C-alpha cells in the first residue's frame, strides 16, 4: 500500500529517491530495459485491479460534480490502459539516451574531451487527473536513469496508488530500486517538495497556466513548464474543403479535453461563405457548440464570441470562430492569443504554409494535418512527460531527450594547464575525433 509520508518524512523519501537515482544511472541499458519490461508485464497482469480503482475514482468524482473535461481526463478505460502499456513497451525499445557521446575532441595528444549524456537525477512531477501520466512518466524516468516523485490530482488518488504499487512491485523483481518511483497524495506535500532543491533536480508541472506560474514562483528548482493549450487552426484562402472539414472535426472532437485540441478556428474571408456552413454542420453533428465573431454570425448559427473566448482553453466541445482578411491577420491573432503550443494551417499554397510555419511562434506548427498529432507517442518518443511551451529546450512534446543532461569527461595522461599558458605555451590541437 502506498502511504503518503508526513511532511517531516518527505525529506527521507527524497533522500532515498536520490540514492535510488544514483544507482539507477549506473545501470546498463539491458538492466534498465528489463525493469521497463517488468513494469509493462506487471501492469498487464493487474489491469482488472487498476480499472476497478479508476472506476472508484470516477464514481467519487461524478458524485462531487466534477467538470466534464476533467472527468474525461480521469477516466482510464481498457483501451486507453492498453495503449499506455504499449507505450511503455515502446520506451523499452527506444535508443538509450545515456552514454551518448555528442562531442569527441582531442585537445592535444593523449588529452581527449567527451560530452556524454547522463541522467538529471530526481524529477518532481505534478500532474492533473490523467492517471496514465503516472505510467508514462515512470517508464521514461527509468529509461533515462532518473528517480521520480509523483503527485497526481486528488481525483485520481486511488488510481495512482494502485498504479504505483504495481510499478514498485514490478521493480522489486529487478535490479532497480522500488524507491526510484514515489507517490505523494496530499496537496500540502507539494509546497515542501518545491523546497527540496538539495534532492530534486527538475519540477515538471502539468496543469493550468496559473498552476504552472504558481510552481515557478514558489521554487528554486528548475521548472519545465507545461501551460495552457490554446491551439488554432487557420483555413487559408487556398484551403481544400475536402481536407478542411475532417481535419477541423478531428482537431476539435477526437479528444476535446486534450491540450492539443483546437479552441479557435480562423477562416479567410475569401472562403468563409463557402466553407463555414458545411463545417458548422459537420461540427454540429459531433455536438460542438460554436461561438463566432460578427462576420461568422452572419453565415452560420452560433453564439456571439467575446474577447475572452480568444484566450480560453475550453477543453470541451466548444469552438470559437473568427473570420480574418489575410494570412498576416491569422498569424498576428495566433501570436497574440495563442499559448505557443500547437497551431496549424490548411492550404494548398505552399508559400503561405511556409510563411505560417516560420512566423507562428509555437512549439508545433502544422500544415494540412490535425493538431492532435502533438503527442510524444505519435512522434515516436514512446511516451511523454508533458508538452513544454517555453522557448528554451526541450520544447514541444518532451520525451527521453528532455530528461537527460550531459557531463564533460576529460581523459589525460598527466596533462597540466600550465603547459598551455604563458611564454612558450603549447598549442591545442582541437581535433574532432
Curated annotation (Swiss-Prot):
Pathway: Amino-acid biosynthesis; L-proline biosynthesis; L-glutamate 5-semialdehyde from L-glutamate: step 2/2. It catalyses: L-glutamate 5-semialdehyde + phosphate + NADP(+) = L-glutamyl 5-phosphate + NADPH + H(+). GO terms for molecular function: glutamate-5-semialdehyde dehydrogenase activity; NADP binding. PROSITE patterns: PROA. Keywords: Amino-acid biosynthesis, Cytoplasm, NADP, Oxidoreductase, Proline biosynthesis. Its EC number is 1.2.1.41. GO terms for biological process: L-proline biosynthetic process. The keyword Cytoplasm applies. It is an enzyme of class 1 (oxidoreductase). Pfam families: Aldedh. GO terms for cellular component: cytoplasm. It is found in: Cytoplasm. Catalyzes the NADPH-dependent reduction of L-glutamate 5-phosphate into L-glutamate 5-semialdehyde and phosphate. The product spontaneously undergoes cyclization to form 1-pyrroline-5-carboxylate. HAMAP family: ProA. This is Gamma-glutamyl phosphate reductase 1. It comes from Synechocystis sp. (strain ATCC 27184 / PCC 6803 / Kazusa). The gene is proA1.
